[in-house]
Amino acid sequence: MPMPQYTMQPQYPVSQPHTLPPLQPHHSQSPAPHSYMGQPPYRPDLSRYPASTHDVYASSAAPIMPHTTVGSLPPSTFLSHHNHQAQAQQSQHYPPPPHNVLPPASSAQTYPQPIAPAPPRDRRPDFNGMPSGAFSYPDGKASPWMNPDPVAAANGAGAYGAKEPPRTQVVGSQGRRGILPSVPGRVAPVTNGVNGTAKNTTIPAKDADGKFPCPHCNKTYLHAKHLKRHLLRHTGDRPYMCVLCKDTFSRSDILKRHFQKCSIRRGNPTGATHLSHPQAHLKRSQAQAAANTAKSLQEEVSSTVPPSNGIAGATFSEGAVNGNGLGAGRPGFTDQQPLGFTMQSVNGLGRGQPDDAYAHGQAHQRASWMATPKQNPYLVQPGTEAPNQQLNVDRPTLEQAKPSVVDPKRPMMPGPDPNHGGGLDWTSMFQAGASDGYINQVFPQSMASGQEPIQAQVETERKFYPTTTTAGPQEGGMNGLYLASTTLGGDGK
């Protein structure tokens, strides 16, 4: 077997396993790199473009003279219908070598049929890894990665294969998918125009499954708003319009996404939103202006009666006391108490009956007493006349009818005579009918006149025991009371 002649062609790489002598040496040598990706000669489903950077043919329809090389099997793009003789000479002089020497894809002797010329390649070989439809060209040329038509390529026609229409990306194409046709036998939809509103669409009643059926097709929807959105596909209405570019959309969410980009591209100097339709905005402003006019007229024709000072009870009172009216017949409260007896008030300001803190003959003194400054109820002198009128109210019927109320923290114990002047008056201390509220006459006159006032709030841990001695009023800490010590010290003196 003759050895390959590497000296005749120094421009070819040594890695090629088999070379052939030139059959027609008068032709110019063309570089033929190993660019046919190792496929059999006639495989229309694979790409057959060489990797050279120049056009092989000037015209795809004219037959080409055979270009033969001294390298290994020439690519299929360099063969034509006229090179049967070259293939016969190859099969006679050089039988096929073993498979371990020659690549399995380069044994072209098993395919003696004529090979069709490939279409001329495009000048954009760098986008072979891109998917189809990634770009569109305005000159109408097909994409270089598009598979050509093998039938047209075999006939020498169709240089660019089957042409695809150029794909143009439309902003908001989600709402432009076309009008859905109606099912035969259903009612044809009535269009409202391109800018029709979606609110005047009549929603049919629910079917047996509790869903809303479409009157134009066989679809059903669980919610009425979804059916409304679907009906826009039948009518072709696009009720939502962009105020910046006057483009219309079928749904508000599509318009919102478009408006965010459109305001960046075109600018939004007025600060309008995606739902600021010009006509709707005009109607809204007119309605608001009409409402403001009606409101101003209503304020002008308002009542001439001056308003009160903000206290509703002041209009019913006999006279304002300290700026607050306390009416004899307040409208919000009834004169009859639900518990059967009169609830006592504190300092005459409770919400009982109107005159519950005063005798019937003392109602005229209400305003003058409340206008005077209050005195400490714990240091009241029983001999004075002015406070005595409010402390010793003549209520014989109430004191006889009601039992004495006992404070649980201060249990009442048997003690001295209630009428005794030197001891504590327990009935007057816890008298429920007393109008001064908490405790009346805690200290006797002898203690309150010359001694320092003792704290009225006594500790709850100590217990009161009545004394058996008749000593002076200052014995035992309080008059007539023995304070038991809570410590281990003794009697607490």
UniProtKB/Swiss-Prot annotation:
Source organism per UniProt: Aspergillus fumigatus (strain CBS 144.89 / FGSC A1163 / CEA10) (Neosartorya fumigata)
Recorded family membership: Belongs to the krueppel C2H2-type zinc-finger protein family.
Zinc finger boundaries on the chain: C2H2-type: 212-234, 240-265
The keyword Heme appears for this protein: no
Keywords: Metal-binding, Nucleus, Repeat, Transcription, Transcription regulation, Zinc, Zinc-finger
Chain intervals with Low complexity compositional bias: 1-18
Function per UniProt: Transcription factor that acts in coordination with atrR to regulate the expression of the ABC-type multidrug transporter abcG1 and thus plays a role in azole susceptibility. Regulates the expression of genes involved in fermentation. Is able to promote expression from the yeast FLO11 promoter.
Start-end of Polar residues biased regions: 69-79, 192-202, 288-307, 484-493
Compartments where located: Nucleus
Higher taxonomy: Eukaryota, Fungi, Dikarya, Ascomycota, Pezizomycotina
PANTHER family the UniProt entry points to: MIP31509P, RFEC
Region (Disordered): 1-50, 68-140, 164-202, 288-316, 468-493
Protein name: C2H2-type transcription factor ffmA
GO CC annotation: chromatin; nucleus
Null allele phenotype: Reduces the growth rate, impairs the production of abcG1 and leads to increased susceptibility to itraconazole.
Entry's transmembrane regions: none
Any GO MF annotation of the entry: DNA-binding transcription factor activity, RNA polymerase II-specific
InterPro entries: VerF-like, Znf_C2H2_sf, Znf_C2H2_type
